[in-house]
């Protein structure tokens, strides 16, 4: 009940922020491109594709999801020392400006893996993704939508961490959907899901 109430408070606050966002990501304030380069690029990459461990790729991410995460960091509801320190310097206009700019970053493909994906593990991962409704919420190509993050091309180590934190309750969400989705998934299955999602290629799945 406590977690549900907290989610409701977050949802209400984010709705207010979202209503003030511009209708199209292409209308992003160009000043935030420079601020992204100076504030965010060192960790997340100039093009939104990070090479640092446990650091998410931002390229291709949706503005509403981005503003949600910045809000959670700013309000201390999502824990990360570095991100919290940065987000606490942002006002509501900054949250909107950065999230709108992030949404303009084109998708940067993940580097080719050193070895071909393990076919059996990919099949297991796909079965788990179907069983636990990953495609139903995040889309057939895992590209997500405004309130649902893009997963395709995300770093495997970051996916592992995120899934583990949702399962443990450490990671908050806009809703309780993710916590419920992974509540009965074993740690080993979470690793298999992360392995699959990080290597998922929609066209390859259709062949």
Where are these regions (language model features)?
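Inter-heme linker and motif-flanking segments adjacent to c-type heme-binding CXXCH motifs
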Residues: 49-50, 79, 104-116, 120, ...
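Extracytoplasmic/secreted proteins, especially bacterial periplasmic and envelope-associated proteins
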Residues: 31, 35, 65, 82-85, ...
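Positively charged n-region of N-terminal signal peptides that target proteins for export
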Residues: 2-4
